[in-house]
Amino acid sequence: MKAAPTRSGGGALVASAILLVLAGEAARAEAPLHPGDSSTFTVMFENDLFGDSDAQYTNGIQIGWMSPDLDRFEQAHQLPPWMTGLSTHLPFIDVPGSQHNVGVALGQKMFTPDDTATRALVRDDRPYAGWLYGGLSFISKTTTRLDSIEIQAGMIGPASFAEDTQRLVHDLRGFDVPAGWDNQLENEPGLALIYEHRRRPWRSENVSGAGYDIITHAGGAVGNVFTYLNAGGEVRVGWNLPADFGTRLIRPGGDTNAPAAINDPRLDNRHRFGVHVFSAVTGRLVLRDIFLDGNTFEDSHSVHKEYLVGDLLFGVSVTFLNAKLSYAEAFRTREFDGQDRVHNFGSLTLSLTF
């Protein structure tokens, strides 16, 4: 038996923050910006309440900051030298003729089985699990290509505070709390190294007004949290397309929302409004997923994962003044043996360039 419908995460908080930010942006003077002068702050919120369910990947939130364009990573003076110094040891990202960015992120994800009413272990469904992490990314880009390497580190298990966060939010909103968190994965430090390459091979000749573009991506990750190879693409059609690298879900690989050229609507005073629809697809060959395979060094609940997993997104994005607001409906194929349906969740992203 399932519990009464419950909801995870801080949807009301995110909505309030979005309204406050947009109000503040509308009041700002329209001073011209440039990628070399402007940082980008991004808030992402994902929840299956948008898909009318409350299980599997049930909630995710991430906040991040991306530096202005830099000639060298060491110019990111907002970060300590030991962080930017890591770039000298990483491949693929110090491409001549490119601009560089450094980004930091903090996020949390929650996973639960379908049956959240029972305290007993649900052996044929995914484990309860949480993931609290920080990320440091290094990006090398032109207007048509982006290479990123991200280092993520954090905690799985009770130390992720996923149960505590869910209990707090559900208590505040009067929802039932899933009863089986005593069966969650054990505490385990997590570490992952992620590389992704994005390219814009096709776009319309118009850089303003009606237009389209296609953005492809490919990459992979290695670590005890997840190890995979991935590839996919995104199609965007609309008015005054942002000069960035598309809209993505909360997943590793660095932020793609920062403007990459001066003709981005968020930087160009002549075109401060834009709107577009988009569709994206991503496929992954999954070799390791701790949220399905269970703890690395401890005996824990696990299920037999699917090695091939895909995501399909449909969404709309609006740029106004210095803000970009995107919403996507995501459909994820079955991730393990016995999962009875495709998983549907919503993804809301607000990026602010300043």
Predicted regions and their residues:
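Sequence/structural signature of outer-membrane beta-barrel proteins
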Residues: E46-F50, F111-D115, I156-S160, R200-S204, ...
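Residue-level signature of outer-membrane beta-barrel architecture
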Residues: W65-S67, Q108, F138-S140, H197-P201, ...
